[in-house]
């Protein structure tokens, strides 16, 4: 039995929440205990570019990207739990980081 920590990141929070719900459902079917999902702080990356290619430095445009995150802890994971997680079909726009913790 071990503890597994999943960190999920995505640009769209709706896709992220659907993915988290699918993971929680799959883990609970195997009998493991789930802690979370814990919402992580949203990271905002802002980019400022000039509108004009030559002059008018005062005229600028600003763009931003928001990266939403969730964290799940799976307590007392069994080999069946790990197998169900590997077979799970997740959205391609969600980045999943898996870390096996100690007991």
Curated annotation (Swiss-Prot):
Q: Which domain of life is it from?
A: Bacteria
> Where does it sit, as one GO cellular component term?
ribonucleoprotein complex
**GN (gene name):** rpsJ
**Which keywords, in A-to-Z order, does the entry hold?**
Ribonucleoprotein, Ribosomal protein
| Quaternary structure and interacting proteins, as annotated | Part of the 30S ribosomal subunit.
Instruction: Answer whether the UniProt record assigns the keyword Cell inner membrane to this protein.
Output: no
Q: Which family does it belong to?
A: Belongs to the universal ribosomal protein uS10 family.
In Pfam terms, one family for this protein is Ribosomal_S10
Question: What is the official name of this protein in its record?
Answer: Small ribosomal subunit protein uS10
| Molecular function as annotated in GO | structural constituent of ribosome; tRNA binding
Q: What does this protein do?
A: Involved in the binding of tRNA to the ribosomes.
Look up and give the organism this protein is from.
Answer: Campylobacter hominis (strain ATCC BAA-381 / DSM 21671 / CCUG 45161 / LMG 19568 / NCTC 13146 / CH001A)
Question: Alphabetically, which GO biological process terms does the record hold?
Answer: translation
């Amino acid at each position: 039995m071990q503890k597994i920590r999943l960190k999920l990141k995505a640009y769209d929070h709706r896709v992220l929440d659907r993915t988290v719900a699918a993971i929680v459902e799959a883990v609970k079917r195997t009998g493991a205990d789930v802690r979370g999902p814990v919402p992580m702080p949203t990271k905002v990356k802002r980019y400022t570019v000039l509108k004009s290619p030559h002059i008018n430095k005062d005229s600028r445009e600003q763009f931003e990207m928001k990266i939403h995150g969730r964290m799940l802890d799976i307590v007392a994971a069994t080999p069946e739990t790990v197998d169900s997680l590997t077979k799970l079909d997740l959205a391609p726009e969600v980045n999943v980081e898996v870390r096996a913790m100690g007991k």
